[in-house]
Amino acid sequence: YCQFKMWTCDSERKCCEDMVCRLWCKLNL
């Protein structure tokens, strides 16, 4: 499950919506 302040970037459970999260995902993939 996606929880507040817990960002996941895997394709099965995408939680990334805002820009900061997407940048974080790019850096952490």
Swiss-Prot record:
Locations listed in the record: Secreted
Domain of life assignment: Eukaryota
GO terms, molecular function: potassium channel regulator activity; toxin activity
Principal localisation: secreted
Keywords carried by this UniProt record: Calcium-activated potassium channel impairing toxin, Disulfide bond, Ion channel impairing toxin, Neurotoxin, Potassium channel impairing toxin, Secreted, Toxin
Residues annotated as signal peptide: none
Disulfide partners: 2-16, 9-21, 15-25
GO cellular component: extracellular region
Tissue expression as described in the entry: Expressed by the venom gland.
Note: Negative results: At concentrations up to 330 nM, does not show activity on transient 'A-type' Kv, delayed-rectifier Kv, voltage-gated sodium channel (Nav) and both HVA and M-LVA Cav channels in cockroach DUM neurons.
Domain notes: The presence of a 'disulfide through disulfide knot' structurally defines this protein as a knottin.
Protein task: Both insecticidal and vertebrate neurotoxin that potently blocks insect calcium-activated potassium (BKCa) channels (Slo-type) in cockroach dorsal unpaired median (DUM) neurons (IC(50)=24.6 nM). This occurs in the absence of any shifts in the voltage dependence of activation. May interact with the turret and/or loop region of the external entrance to the channel and does not project deeply into the pore of the channel. Also shows toxicity to mice by introcerebroventicular injection.
Protein family: Belongs to the neurotoxin 30 (phrixotoxin) family.
Protein's UniProt name: Lambda-theraphotoxin-Ec2c
Source organism of this protein record: Eucratoscelus constrictus
